[in-house]
Amino acid sequence: MLATKMSVTFCFLLMLTTVMLPTEAKTVAGRTACTQHTSCDTPGAKYCCQNSDCCGGSEHFCASFGQCMRSF
């Protein structure tokens, strides 16, 4: 009986961890990208949170990894 309870508890914790990890990682990645937001005057790669953060008007968009990219 004790082995069954421990097995059920272990499975529950494993399931909970599996569900929570991707969400937490995404939040951390989103925060990292947004704290690295750069202005148009800074040379080099531009980091962003949304499309309007990118310089160059509608030709540029904010990629999912938080960097401005030029659309082709």
From Swiss-Prot:
Residues 1-21 form the signal peptide. GO terms for molecular function: toxin activity. It comes from the Eukaryota. One of its GO terms (cellular component) is extracellular region. Contains 4 disulfide bonds. It is found in: Secreted. Keywords: Disulfide bond, Secreted, Signal, Toxin. Residues 22-31 form a propeptide. Expressed by the venom duct. Belongs to the teretoxin H (TH) superfamily. The cysteine framework is XI (C-C-CC-CC-C-C). This is Teretoxin Tan11.1. It comes from Terebra anilis (Auger snail).
